[in-house]
Amino acid sequence: MMLRVLVFFYFILVSSSAFSKEIPVIVISAGKTPQSKSTVGSDVTVIDSKTLRNSNEFFIGDILDNKLNGINYFQSGGYGTVSGIQLRGQPKRYTTVYIDGVKASDPSTPSNDYYFNNLISGSFDRVEVLKGAQSSLYGSGALAGTIQLFSKKGRDGHNNDINVSKGSFDTRKVDLSFDGKENNYDYFVGFTNFETAGESAMRDNDEKDGYRNDSLTMNYGYNINENFRLENYLYYND
């Protein structure tokens, strides 16, 4: 059983202009501050919430593999097996992964590893893929680029959502979420359960490779004033 818990707590300094007008498509990864995609010189692709929601795939790695050119997504077997992403043909150690601005790639390993096999799309709002050398911004582990994932935030009012999907091999996914936004604060709580009886990864073998994944995402944000925002994140995967 694999258990991963990420807890994030930090302050964000935001330019007041970010609140004064709405930009149709913005990116953060290209310069670490919100900016219009049309002004970015780097090769950046944004997979928005609508694309994630309408995808037939359950996992982030599979969605990136289907939607992007110039990447190599590999997996050693069925659901839950070791997987990784290469950008522009470079070894995967040169692609750094961030979740809500916090580095998720394991710096303690020589290969700067991050495995996408347990990363379900249900609680994420968008993904930014920045291709090309980004060492000046993100260090030597980003020679091929970065992949940044941003979790969902609370919407106006108080909202409850449930989504149930079912497929072959007794595959089913349940997404539950609660979110809200009022005055200066917003929150989001999302839980996803994914289960499948699976199929054998070996030829001429009837033994099924079953898999189960439970993930929990929580975040809370508070706008202290026009320039400062406090955010707390928790990401749990079992």
Task: Describe the function of each predicted region.
Residues 103-131:
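Short acidic/polar hinge/loop motifs at secondary-structure boundaries
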Residues 18-20:
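Boundary at the C-terminal end of the N-terminal hydrophobic targeting segment
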Residues 25-55, 84, 92:
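N-terminal periplasmic "start-of-domain" segments of outer-membrane beta-barrel proteins
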Residues 136, 148, 156-157, 165, ...:
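Periplasmic-side early beta-strands and strand-to-turn transitions of outer-membrane beta-barrels
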Residues 61, 65-103, 125:
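Extracytoplasmic beta-strand/coil segments of soluble accessory domains associated
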Residues 78, 117, 122, 140, ...:
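Transmembrane beta-barrel outer-membrane domains
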Residues 60-64, 83-86, 95-98, 114-120, ...:
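N-terminal periplasmic accessory domains that precede
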